[in-house]
Amino acid sequence: MLDIKKIRQEPDFYKEKLATRGVKPEEIDEVIALDKKRRELLQQTETMKAQRNEASKKIGEAKRNGESADAAIKETRELGDKIKELDTEVEANDAELHDKMAHLPNVPHDGVPVSLTEDGAVELRKVGKVRDFDFEPKHHWDIGENLGILDFDRAGKVSGARFVYYLGLGAQLERAVYNFMLDEHMKEGYTEVLPPYIVNADSMYGTGQFPKFKEGVYQVNGEDMTLIPTAEVPLTNYYRGEVIPTEELPVYVTALTPSFRSEAGAAGRDTRGLIRMHQFNKVEMVKYTKPENSWDELEKMTANAENILKKLNLPYHVITLTTGDMSFTASETHDLELWMPAQNKYREVSSCSNCLDFQARRMHTQYRDENGKLQYVHTLNGSGLAVGRTVAAILENYQNADGSVTIPEVLVPYMHGVTKITKENAVPFRNKVNK
C-alpha cells in the first residue's frame, strides 16, 4: 500500500513513476479526488459535532432557566441525523478509496529499467561456464521419464495437467536439493520456519496477492481460506498487526513449502516438464529490516540465492526486471535464471525483491526508531530456490550420453553416497525389471 499523504503531496511524481507500471494518470486523479472528498466530509462531520455540542448546552441552559428546550432538542436530533448520514458517506468513500489504493502497485526504484513488458531487463552478471555437449542434450522431462524418476502421465490420471510424481532417486534428489538449500540459508543466519499452507484473506491482502490476483490461486470453497501460492505469504504475515522489537531487526526467516498456483493465463506455455506446475516445492527467504538497510539486504539476499547455484555448479545469470515485469509489491527485483541446455536459454529460478514499506503498510507491521517513534519496517522476499526448476536444471546440465545423470558433488552426502542416477538404481521397486 502506498502512502496517500505522499500521493497528495507529489501527484505528478506518482503519475510518472506508476505510468511505467501501467497505471493511468486518471487512476491517481481518482485517488486524490476521493482523498480530498474524505477530508472534506470529515471536516463537515467535525463542524456538525461541534454544533450539536452547542445545541446540547442550550438544552441544559433552557432547563436550568425553566424555559422550553424544544427548539434545541430538535436541532440536536437533526444534527445527529445529518452526522449519521455523513458517517455513512464517509464509510462508502473510504471503501472506494481503499479499494483503489489496494490496486496501485509499488513505486519502482530509480534505475529499474523502464518497460511495460519483460523486454529490456538488464543483465547484471553471468556466472558459470555453459557446458559444451558432445551429444544432443535432452529435455529434463525426457531424461526423467526415461529413467523412471518422473511420471507425468500417472499424475495426469490422478490430478490432471501440470502435476508430477517423483519416484525413487528422483524423489530423493528433490529432497536433497531442498535440504541443501535450507542448510545453506541457515548458515547465513536465517531461522527455519514450518508455516501453515492455508491462509486467510487478510494474509493474502497483506502481501499483495489480494484483491488483484485472486484468479491465480486456489481458494477453499465456502471459506475465507486460500492455499498458499508461495511461503512469502505466511512468512511475511507472521508479524502482521504487530510492532517488532527493534533489537530483533533484521529478522531473517526461511521455509520449504509447497506452492499452489492455478497458472491462470498460462495456457500453452511450458506444457511439459517441471517449469510451470500447479503444485511445486519452493524454499523461500523473507527479511524484515529497518528502512535504511533494505537495499543492502536485497544484495545480500540475492547473494544468498546465488550461493546455492554456485555450489551446485550450475550456470546462471542475474538480471534486473523491468518496471512492467516486477511483482505488484516490488520496488526492485533481481531474477536469477538458470541455463537450460535443451531449451538453449535461461529460465527463472529465483526472484529477490525489495518491497520497501509497501507490504508493511498493508499489514500494519512496525518498529520503534531510536526516538521511540513508530515506523513501518521494510520487507524483502526471495526464492531460495524453486526446487523443481533446480532439479530440472540438474537433470539437463548433469546428463550423460547414456541417459544417466551425475549427482552434483555437493549433493552426494544428501543422496546417501549415490553419485549417479541410472536406470538400474533409479526406482528400487523396478530394479528387478531393469536387471
Curated annotation (Swiss-Prot):
Q: Can you cite an annotated GO cellular component?
A: cytoplasm
Coiled coil segments of this chain: none
Q: Catalysed reaction(s)? A: tRNA(Ser) + L-serine + ATP = L-seryl-tRNA(Ser) + AMP + diphosphate + H(+); tRNA(Sec) + L-serine + ATP = L-seryl-tRNA(Sec) + AMP + diphosphate + H(+)
Query: Which spans does this entry mark as compositional bias, Basic and acidic residues?
Result: 49-68
EC number(s): the record gives 6.1.1.11
List the residue ranges of the region (Disordered): 48-68
The pathway entry for this protein reads as: Aminoacyl-tRNA biosynthesis; selenocysteinyl-tRNA(Sec) biosynthesis; L-seryl-tRNA(Sec) from L-serine and tRNA(Sec): step 1/1
Q: Would the keyword Ligase be found if you checked this record's keyword annotation?
A: yes
Q: Which GO terms describe its molecular function?
A: ATP binding; catalytic activity, acting on a protein; serine-tRNA ligase activity; transferase activity
Residues that coordinate or bind L-serine: T230, A231, E232, E284, S383
Q: Where is the protein situated, by its record's location annotation?
A: Cytoplasm
- What's the superkingdom here? Bacteria
Q: Tell me which PROSITE patterns the record gives.
A: AA_TRNA_LIGASE_II (PS50862)
Entry text on domains: Consists of two distinct domains, a catalytic core and a N-terminal extension that is involved in tRNA binding.
Protein name, please? Serine--tRNA ligase
Q: What species was this sequence derived from?
A: Limosilactobacillus reuteri (strain DSM 20016) (Lactobacillus reuteri)
